[in-house]
């Protein structure tokens, strides 16, 4: 919990001091990496991750730049990238898949600026690459401060294995779920392509985070929690932004970032024992990205109520579309349960 919260806070502060257009981006990448990896990445893994992030961002930029003035062509092209990302995620069978997550992140955010101007899209690609490097260093530093215990790593691996076993491996269902996720995210992205706004980044990253971490075996309860998670995340960011306006900039940024991150980190840890970890991670990403807008050296003229309303509307859309389009997967009974039931 402390590792995740301090990583998010340090990433916010470092991104702000580095003049990153969106300081919340480094923080969002750091928490996604920490939530996916029970151990610190090795040097080779870290280098590969940076290459993957930069490469996927470049691929999304190339597609968006090629078809920026032809939405009828751009839409299916982006749909293919989303399909590849979600397919990689589904085939991970409950295990973390950072390449899939990073491809989905890049496909969601890079085209929004690229369709406005190629130079803006190229800037986002460079920002993603530098944010990835900072996030990796922060992850290493946090693991040095808070080493991963053997028991915790074993528990995490067991939980992942149990979750993977709880979902039947059905290729047809997996393809259906992947297509459903593409159908959910594409309309949201098309909306922000038509109406570009700074809120596209927290909104789309939050949507991608939820769909990537969504657990088919949990059921609809996580949709109800999603509304609460995004609402809490946006309100917490609004409160933190208000404190940032009246207090010393850097101390206020660190304090409010830490308080908000601690709350969501505790929720994520608790969610690993019951439904809600995917939603808690989505809420944390929403909080970090919205708070990052307030801390950014670039001025984003987005009123606080508009931020909350926009995230709230996207949450309602996500809940409705997910309930309508995503099929439920029945958990596989534990090994030997059928025999015990027969004997009973």
Predicted regions and their residues:
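Alpha-helical transmembrane segments and their membrane-interface boundaries
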Residues: 1-98, 112-258, 263-344
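Intrinsically disordered, low-complexity glycine/charged-rich regulatory or linker segments
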Residues: 106-107
